[in-house]
């Protein structure tokens, strides 16, 4: 079993159910909190848009993209207020400037990707995109492809590792999570055999390096600590609705002690509070 980072885990974590939003989305996937914490942006796949939720009530208060997106799967937002959206069924990533709840389309990327379902704006300036239909990850620099990793199977999420350089990739069709270098070299593998993944999708990272992954077809959220152990699993492996129950969950976003999850099969977002055990 592989170590996730060199940062020690200080304490185990528990998660307490807080609130479930209304079922007003359609197969929500990954989500992202705005840099100022005021808005929760959700990839609303079935509605071909990015839905904007109040982070507390989890009600939809706005949206953008429904007039030109198709099958929206992922969103990332950089510190400058630009949003990068996996416009999956159009086989492109759309780029926007964001001002509160207003989005302006300013560009797109589509070279050598089909059906993108994951996007990451890296601190190194590159934009990394996972092509779920083309089974690859490409790195764009100044709008041009500079690197490519082939031989994947329906790759999904891309998340920045805690060291600020590495990239975690959900290689969904192979039921594994990979740690990549910025040059797309595979450094580590979290395998199906070790973690019983079945369609691992979107992820986020705690400050200590703990990886939180939505294991879609197991209807679970798995916490994998830096020492490779799995101290917490939310969900009993069966589809459901209610505290600690999910149906094909996809999206994960964490900020401080708050954890938001896309309970995709139930068409809603749920919120949990993270607690550390002494």
Which role does the model predict for each range below?
Residues 54-58, 97-101, 140-144, 181-185, ...:
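Short loop/turn segments that connect beta-strands within beta-propeller blades
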Residues 22-35, 67-79, 111-123, 151-165, ...:
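Beta-rich, blade/repeat-based domains predominating
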Residues 42-46, 85-91, 129-133, 167-175, ...:
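Conserved beta-strand positions in repeat-built beta-propeller and related beta-rich domains
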Residues 248-278:
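Blade-level signature of beta-propeller repeat domains, shared across WD40, Kelch, NHL, RCC1
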Residues 61-123, 128-134:
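A generic tandem-repeat structural signature
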Residues 7-33, 38-42, 272:
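An edge-strand/N-cap motif at the start of beta-rich repeat modules
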Residues 15-22, 59-65, 102-109, 144-150, ...:
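A short beta-strand motif characteristic of beta-propeller blades
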């Amino acid at each position: 079993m592989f170590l996730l980072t060199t940062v020690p885990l200080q304490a185990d974590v528990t998660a307490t159910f807080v609130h479930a939003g209304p079922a007003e989305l359609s197969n929500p996937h990954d989500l992202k909190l705005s840099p100022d914490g005021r808005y929760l942006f959700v990839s609303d796949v079935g509605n071909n848009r990015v839905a904007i939720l109040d982070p507390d009530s989890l009600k939809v208060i706005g949206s953008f993209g429904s007039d030109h997106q198709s099958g929206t799967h992922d969103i990332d937002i950089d510190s400058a207020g630009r949003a990068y959206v996996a416009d999956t069924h159009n086989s492109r990533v759309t780029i926007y400037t964001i001002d509160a709840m207003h989005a302006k389309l300013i560009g797109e990327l589509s070279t050598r990707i089909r059906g993108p379902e994951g996007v990451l704006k890296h601190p190194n300036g590159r934009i990394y995109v996972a092509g779920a239909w083309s089974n690859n990850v490409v790195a764009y620099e100044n709008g041009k492809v500079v690197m490519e990793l082939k031989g994947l199977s329906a790759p999904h999420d891309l998340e920045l590792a805690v060291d600020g350089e590495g990239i975690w990739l959900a290689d969904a069709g192979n039921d594994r999570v990979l740690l990549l270098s910025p040059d797309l070299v595979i450094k580590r593998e979290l395998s199906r055999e070790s973690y019983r993944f079945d369609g691992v999708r979107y992820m986020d990272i705690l400050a200590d390096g703990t990886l939180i992954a939505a294991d879609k077809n197991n209807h679970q959220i798995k916490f994998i600590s830096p020492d490779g152990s799995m101290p917490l699993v939310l969900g009993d492996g069966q589809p459901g609705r209610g505290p600690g129950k999910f149906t094909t969950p996809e999206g994960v976003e964490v900020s401080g002690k708050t954890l938001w999850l896309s309970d995709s099969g139930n068409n809603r977002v749920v919120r949990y509070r993270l607690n550390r055990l002494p």
